[in-house]
Regions:
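Short, composition-biased local secondary-structure segments
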Residues: 10-17, 36-40, 115-118
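Short glycine- and Lys/Arg-enriched binding-loop motifs that mark or flank ligand-binding interfaces
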Residues: 3, 20, 33-36, 57, ...
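Conserved functional loop/turn residues at catalytic and ligand-binding sites
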Residues: 10, 75, 96
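Conserved phosphate-binding/catalytic loop of the ribokinase/pfkB sugar-kinase fold
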Residues: 56, 81-83, 93-130
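Substrate-binding N-lobe of the ribokinase-like
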Residues: 23-90
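Positively charged, low-complexity intrinsically disordered leader regions
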Residues: 1-23
Length: 130
């Protein structure tokens, strides 16, 4: 099956904390890990691993190069990803010792999609002009 996914790309910054911050608090985290994320990225990788021919379309900004690499290494076609000089989307995720999380999203280039870009992607995909 041939799948087009026009989906989000985020860098996930996961901070392990003993408890969530409260207003006015400043604390050090116990650790920091960086992951590839975004619902769109996760869906594209899962669909490719399931044996589908997947094409991912998105706008990718500064700081997100690893996201395109992760997609490509998972067998996802990344030819329709448009580069941008703006900052890519990211998530700041606090995870406490019980595994609960608190997430702050920055949309970044995920919010810069234009009608023209979407129309171009759909035309290329529909006409096999990839």
């Amino acid at each position: 099956m041939k799948i087009l996914n026009l989906g989000s790309l985020n860098v996930d910054y996961v901070y392990k904390v003993d408890k969530f911050l409260l207003p006015g608090e400043t604390k050090s985290s116990l650790s920091l890990n960086t992951y590839c994320g975004g619902k769109g990225l996760n869906q594209s990788i899962a669909a490719a691993k399931a044996g589908n021919e997947v094409y991912h379309a998105a706008v990718l900004g500064k700081g997100g190069e690893m996201l395109k690499t992760a997609l490509s290494e998972s067998g996802v076609n990344v030819d329709m990803i448009q580069p941008s000089d703006e900052t890519c989307g990211h998530a700041i995720i606090q995870v406490d010792e019980k595994g609960q999380n608190c997430i702050l999203l920055y949309g970044g280039t995920n919010r810069t999609l234009t009608k023209e870009y979407i129309d171009d992607v759909l035309d290329k995909f529909g006409n096999n002009g990839l």
